C-alpha cells in the first residue's frame, strides 16, 4: 500500500538510492496542493513546503504540459535543473530571493504562518490572488533561511494542444485496490 505523504517518502528514497547526481522533480496533486507552507490535518499543524521535506530539486504544479516538455527539452541538452529558474508552473528552493526571474510577491514566511493565523490567512489570500496565468506573479516564501520560489502558473493550452491531450489513449482503468469494492462507478 501507499505510505502517508507518499511524495516525500518516495522522493527521499530516490535520493538515497541515486544520490545528488540524478535530478528529482515532483508533481501531481500532492505536490501541487502542498507547495507552500500548509496546514496538515494528520499532524494538526502547519508544515513546510513539500519541496523542503521531499528533498526534490524542482516541483511542477498544475497540469504541467508546458513545464514537463520544457524540462525534458533542457535535460536533453544537459542543462542542470538548478539552472531552470524561468519555467512557468514550477517551484524551487533558493538561497537568495533574487534568484526569482519573474515579477514577484513575498508571502509571510513559514515561521510567520506557523505563529499567526492572520499571517496564514494573508499568505493564502495572496496565493489565490496570484494564481492567474495571465497576471499572476511569482510567489516567494522564506523557509528556515531558504526561499521557496513558486513561478507564475503556466499559460493555458491552445485549442489544438488541448485537442491533442484529449486524443491520447487513456486506459480509463481504476487502481486494482478498488476491485474488492466493485471498482469505481464513475469510470
Regions from the language model: what does each represent?
Residues 121-187:
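N-terminal [4Fe-4S]-dependent radical SAM core
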